Amino acid sequence: MLDRRQLMTGVVASLFGSLVLPRRSAAAQQTGLLALTDRLSLVTSGGTNVLAFASPDGLVLVDSGAPDRSDALMTSLRALAPDVRARTLFNTHWHAENTGANQIFRQNGAAIVAHENTRLWMATPTWMPDEDRYRPPRTKEAQPDKTFYADGAMTAGNERIEYGYLIEAHTSGDIYVFFRDSNVLAVGDVASPARDPELDYLTGAWIGGRVDAMDRLLKLADANTRIVPGFGPVMTRAQLQVERDVMKTIYDRTVDRVREGDYVEDMLKAGVMNGLARTWKDPKKFLHDLHKGLWAHHNKLDANVV
């Protein structure tokens, strides 16, 4: 996955809603743990966000961090469960920085749950254009062993956990995981509050899919829902709404231009990225990926695509 980070700017504070999110204490910064409820914690020591739910039957995790941060992740998790025994690990998508410790957890008995497309991408050599190479398949032990296509649910420690498919938003295998009773919604990289949104067009993502996925998330959430992205701070529903509206504005500004033959420089000159409620570190990269994704879904652009 490409590590293109940037800061959200220009969003008026009143849009952030009334939900007060917990601040990271010095202890939280040291341990990499941020308590969201008495049983649910955000773990940041893995390089990307890992959500950990402590149940009597073992931990339920959402994502497993970056490959080079596994030791730090395990150290943090021991504060929640000394034996770091995981019952279930959800993968929100296939990218290595979010699934780096998969093999460790599966070898220790965890079931890895993901969309079937995520398993397929992990099992397949994948072209990495920024690195000019193919990424080899992941080991069998690192791949999900329980996959689904639409949605599902489970219970852990009296907590209802719902999960479902988010079609072609960041990859072709994105899912959400909703801790219903705790009102905490993990969305992977379908939300991107702290770096450039990535449209991994090579594995199926496009901006129309991202808008649709965010609309589904907004229907699940309420004003008190804490939304956990794959990287960056916990979000409110109001903040997710702002990001969704930015994506929809860009879609509206670009879909006709792409159909008519515009490329990145043309769209930048036309100001398609101007006046938005966030900035980009690399707008050219974002528009390049947007362009590729739109053409991959050209049948959805207009009946008269040439």
Predicted regions mapped to residue ranges:
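N-terminal secretory signal peptides and thylakoid transit peptides that target proteins
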Residues: M1-L15
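Active-site HxH/HxHxD metal-binding segment of metal-dependent hydrolases
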Residues: A79-A153, S172
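Metallo-beta-lactamase
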Residues: G58-L59, A66-D68, A153, R160, ...
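C-terminal regulatory/interaction regions
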Residues: V264-V306
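Conserved beta-strand hairpin/beta-sheet module of binuclear metal-dependent hydrolase folds
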Residues: G32-L77, V177-D189
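Boundary at the C-terminal end of the N-terminal hydrophobic targeting segment
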Residues: A27-A28
